[in-house]
Amino acid sequence: MASTTGGTVAVVGATGRQGGQVVRHLLAEGWRVRALSRTPAGKKGAELNGLGADVVYGDLEDAASLDSAFAGVSGIFAMQPPGAASIEDEVRQGMNAARAAARASVAHVVYGSAGPGDAETGVRQWDAKLRVARGMNDLRLPLTVLRPMAFMELMVDPTFYPQSSTWYTMPRLAGVDRRIPWLSVHDLGAIAARAFAEPERFIGKDLRLAADVKSLAECRQVFRSVKGKNPPRFPMPLFLFRRFVDDDILTMWRWLRENPVDADTGPTYEILPTAKDVRAFLQAAS
């Protein structure tokens, strides 16, 4: 199948984890990248500029900034950064990007979504992304939706506080034996770049992505096997943990306990044969 590179892709959320990986993979494959940031002169913006990206101002609450950032691009990687105060705020931000993409008549939008599927769950961040994807389809955008469930970085990234979150509170609420589909942020970036390179293959697709499906108990066993010790845990009372995280995270974990989610890893490996399972991810993170 024909592969297309060499155009310009605008990346929303470029200084975050997901957007940052998308930027890196696109640059590595020969794309020109316009990286959107609310603080383009900041440290993270300077880092992306050093990699070769054109870092520009872009704010999902500022339609004019999106029109400027999207002008002349062939593709857009769209997502809503975390932290919206309400589902309405997140949907508004996502649709601001969608309408700007429509005004720019871009050839391909790759949307970073999340969650289990097509039905709303009561988990705000999942439901907001579902509504945005529907809105993008209503606008008839040439769309690919990437829908991971949980990122492997939750196990090791200190900014996620895995000692108190992934290895302590999450198993208490979601269930230690509940099987969860996992994908690394690195592999999400690689899959996004692949989608832009092969638009005729991916436009119109809603891709549920998983490179591994394991319970937290199984992940704990793999962690011990790879690193020679159990993952660190810091027991924190739930009332105290809630001071550090959005209640929507707790809603998500409780939803997982009551709603089994399985996934077929085959389609992900068809797109990216080098995708890492939990063991390979933890080995690389050692």
Report the location of each language-model feature.
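A hydrophobic C-terminal alpha-helical subdomain
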Residues: A2, F202, V226-K227, F234-S286
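Oxidoreductase cofactor-interface core, primarily capturing Rossmann-like NAD(P)-dependent enzymes
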Residues: A2-E47, E61-A64, A69-V73, Q80-V91, ...
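Acidic/proline-rich low-complexity IDRs
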Residues: A35, E47-G50, I271, F281
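Short, conserved active-site loop motifs that form the nucleotide-linked donor/cofactor pocket
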Residues: G52-A53, L143
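Cofactor-binding loops of NAD(P)H-dependent oxidoreductases
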Residues: G58
